[in-house]
Amino acid sequence: MNITNCTTEASMAIRPKTITEKMLICMTLVVITTLTTLLNLAVIMAIGTTKKLHQPANYLICSLAVTDLLVAVLVMPLSIIYIVMDRWKLGYFLCEVWLSVDMTCCTCSILHLCVIALDRYWAITNAIEYARKRTAKRAALMILTVWTISIFISMPPLFWRSHRRLSPPPSQCTIQHDHVIYTIYSTLGAFYIPLTLILILYYRIYHAAKSLYQKRGSSRHLSNRSTDSQNSFASCKLTQTFCVSDFSTSDPTTEFEKFHASIRIPPFDNDLDHPGERQQISSTRERKAARILGLILGAFILSWLPFFIKELIVGLSIYTVSSEVADFLTWLGYVNSLINPLLYTSFNEDFKLAFKKLIRCRE
């Protein structure tokens, strides 16, 4: 995203970059762009070619990968040209298109993380009922909603820019506006509200999972002296869930959900007969789940929070930042599109197998 307040040419004046600096910056950004493109393409191809991954939850991840791929293909390359050349030389129309695509795709990527968290929350806390509702149509509706909200958040500047008497300097390509209300509206809608919702959802997911781990431990202890079929029935009964295997295994929250798919317990499993051992296993799983959630939330917050803090303080005329700082924070946000395909697939064995198949085919 490239949003800034109106500034004078003097205030925008910066020290020209040396050839060496431009080369280093260009190489770094090209590597980021290339990796982002390849990783998101790999996710899309893995889901498209692997029947086992054709699940509603994975459709959300695929849509996220498509959105991040658009950031890598349509947004990052023009940003590299703009940064390296220190000025915009591609014309007013292309500038307008680039800024609109930038804001829409980045906002959409953030909102995808929100609906993925919501999908996982429902899958954990309302498993039986949501398993019936978790369909491809529902996933498509969630994706359509995300894109609609993103467009409503990012498009308003187009209308007032088209009515401005003075066009922005041809050497600049930034959204120049003095609309404080829009600054608040866009930052709240694109980041702060989704961030709040994501934090609440993952907090509740963790506590729900922790409770379910404890119930699973209790059900195992009570069913150790039953037959295998009796164990399966009793465990399902005690956990108030059902024995299924169609939960999405692509989620990093798989550690939370997978006990639904593996309720069957070997008879006379004396290894788990001691409360201390059961508690240790439960504690290990809780720590692993906490680490996964910490990675997801940490990557998202570290990538986008600095940018949106800058947007508020600059948009509200509290403080101004140099173009170098603005570019760095913008690309820090773009890096989230590189991290997403790693975080949302690397904890799942089905995705790992699909990636291995893709690599073997290329070899």
UniProtKB/Swiss-Prot annotation:
It is a multi-pass membrane protein. One of its GO terms (biological process) is chemical synaptic transmission. InterPro entries: 5HT_rcpt (IPR002231), GPCR_Rhodpsn (IPR000276), GPCR_Rhodpsn_7TM (IPR017452). SMART domains: 7TM_GPCR_Srsx. Its main location: membrane. GO terms for cellular component: dendrite; plasma membrane; synapse. Disulfide bonds join C95-C173. It comes from the Eukaryota. This is 5-hydroxytryptamine receptor 1E. Residues 1-21, 85-92, 158-179, 317-322 are extracellular. GO terms for molecular function: G protein-coupled serotonin receptor activity; Gi/o-coupled serotonin receptor activity; neurotransmitter receptor activity; serotonin receptor activity. Residues 46-59, 119-138, 204-291, 346-363 are cytoplasmic. A motif (DRY motif) lies at residues 119-121. Keywords: Cell membrane, Disulfide bond, G-protein coupled receptor, Glycoprotein, Membrane, Receptor, Transducer, Transmembrane, Transmembrane helix. The chain crosses the membrane at residues 22-45, 60-84, 93-118, 139-157, 180-203, 292-316, 323-345. Glycans are attached at N2, N5. It is found in: Cell membrane. A motif (NPxxY motif) lies at residues 340-344. Serotonin binds at D102, C106. Belongs to the G-protein coupled receptor 1 family. G-protein coupled receptor for 5-hydroxytryptamine (serotonin). Also functions as a receptor for various alkaloids and psychoactive substances. Ligand binding causes a conformation change that triggers signaling via guanine nucleotide-binding proteins (G proteins) and modulates the activity of downstream effectors, such as adenylate cyclase. HTR1E is coupled to G(i)/G(o) G alpha proteins and mediates inhibitory neurotransmission by inhibiting adenylate cyclase activity.
